[in-house]
Each structure stands twice: as C-alpha cells, then as structure tokens.
C-alpha cells in the first residue's frame, strides 16, 4: 500500500497546503512541484516517520526556492520544524557551496539527516538511471555520505535509509547473482507479484522501491 495523503493530520495538511501555495506554478521536471514533496513524505512514511518530520517534508524547499522566510515557518509551524527545514536549506552561490552549507547545518542538527536522506532518496528514485541528474547524485554520494553518514549512526532505521539510497546510487550494490536468476525467471514467466516479493526479500525494501528495481531490471 502506498502513502495516502488523505490520512495526514491537521498540522501536516496545513504544511502541505502552505507549501502548495508557496511553490505556486513551480515544476519538478514535467510535474507540479508538490509531486517531489509528496515523494519525500512517502519515503519518510516508508520508515515510520511522521510528526514534525512529516511537516518538514512538505516545507523543506520553501525557504530555498520561494519568498517564504524562516521567520514565517517558525511562526506558523514552530521552532523544531524550522530547524529541520533550515538545516537542509543550502545557502551559497553554487551547488557545491550550497551543499557544504547544508552539510554543516545538518551536522549541527543531526535529526535533519533523516529529512535530507528522504529528500535525496526521492530525487534519486525520480531520476532515470542514465540521466545527468543521476550522474550528479552518484558523483556527490561519497562526499554526501562522508559528511552525513556518521550522524545517528546507531539508529537502525537511519541505517536502513542509507541502505536504500546506497542501492539506488551505487550500481555495485545488488542482490546476489543466484537471487537475480530466480527474479529474472519469475519476470519471464509473468509472475510479477512473486518477482516483486523476491526483490523485497533480496533487498529488504518496500513495494515502491521494489517496483523501481524491477523496472530498471526490465
């Protein structure tokens, strides 16, 4: 079962509507920008996160990409949500500088690594394997992980988030060959549900990620 936006609580609905208004006509590729925000929220849901992290998922780009100010976020949604949003807001003249700025703020507010992982995972999963965006994320990944990998390192849920992102960005991370033989056999036989279950078992992932892995295998 996918993430159901109809089940958001009042505070998250407020955050979603606020972001929808703030981003206006902005696009995420060919799609309305809310598509990306919903994808980030869905990744958090896959790992059981909600509350302030859920609110921050909808709001994480409003300070960086719209006229909304940090003060507005704090006044409307509180200090913790602002701290999460501000930590992942990159400030600087170019991408490298913005990344470094965000890394330093996330290190100072470690809980924000959960939000940043969800954001990067959603971006990577939305990028075709051979696209320039995927190439950029793969190039950045060693530095990204060197800065943020030590944060909340003892948290098993955060570790699983890293595993999901690593699988997406590192082509060398894959299921053992014998498992792929069985998965490919099931796909060839038209046993999609069984192939999906085999991918979930091999990668210890949810149905959404398993569908992406199968789609790339096709």
Task: Spell out what each predicted region is.
Residues 1-177:
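Active-site helical microenvironments for divalent-metal-assisted chemistry
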Residues 175-218:
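Short, amphipathic alpha-helical interaction segments embedded in low-complexity terminal/linker regions
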